[in-house]
Amino acid sequence: MKVYNETLLRNEYAQKMARKWHLEGMLTTEQLAEAQLIHAAVPYNPNLFIKIGLFVFAQACFFFGGSFGFLLVGAGVSFSIVSFLYAIATAFLLVRFIPQKQLHFSGIDNALIYGVIGATMPLIFEIYESLKIDELWIAAALCLPILVLVVYSFGEPLVALGMFLCGLFIVASLLMKNPIGKALLPFALMLYAAGFFIVTRKLSQQPTAFYWKTAIYWLNTTALVVFYAGGNYFVVREANAQLNNLPAPSPEIAFAGLFWGFTFLIPFLYLYGGFRWRDRTLFVLGLLGMVASVLTFRYYHTVLPVEWGMILGGAAATLVAFGVIRQLKMPKYGFSYAPEKDDEERLAIETIVVSQITNNIHSVENGVEFGGGDFAGGGAGEKY
């Protein structure tokens, strides 16, 4: 089941978009106020520093609670059983605590989610050891249902990333059992990543997938990185040498021309996708992939001295950046050099904070007035 209140999440997103459109002049101040009134109920979302503090505090409470529970039960009961029961009890309380306090990735819930997953691991590894099968992918397969359940219920992005990597490890482990599997490993990893990307991208276009929006974004980005790494010549060649215990320098690999093609073709595909779908993630990954491709080529083939390569590369990048900036002074094809409104909003917030600090410095004689705070009392708010 979905633990978080999806209505609150949609209200939070609606307020964010309303503020953005107001900054862009698409909404008047009255319309912004009306939108914020309609979507007034939002989850608790403190600033980053408070999130970190709450995360550390919740983790400490979770570990102290588990230690206290184990001391109460005594040493006569299996640690894995006690840990698993503690995980179930914590999950039961968490499912009721989140709607009551209207949390969403506030630090407390993240810490307890990770704690619940960690508390189930001793029992899973005890089951794995009882099977007496010396295959790590079986342990990963036993963990996978827990991760899938947590991702479905909470949509936690870091757990979703762990789920993706867990499946990747299972696929790689199965293929590495024989020479043919090792030879097909790069293609299998690319297919795995491509399949994940296609499925999650189609899922992200469905209105019902809003609940998992952040997790899907993390999965998409990770799948794109793995897809490129699986086809990169440097990664394939060096991994082949490591897996087969070959001496340095690593020998040439089979289908070298194909992987050289992947090394340079995949970044161009990402760039094309970024332009085609106005996708910043694809565009940035395409640029980073181009840099990685050039470095890969430079690693195996010395064309110019390093100094000349850096000078010419920097000059070319500067000229390209200058030309693109000039062309995009006026928006073209959906692209613009204009700064992001979010950046302007952050700058405005920083200006307000600095002015408030300055005013406080010059008005110390008024005394300290407590009260009015939204978090922890004493006038301390949870956000600027």
Language-model features: where?
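Alpha-helical multi-pass membrane segments and their bilayer interfacial helix-loop junctions
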Residues: M1-Y384
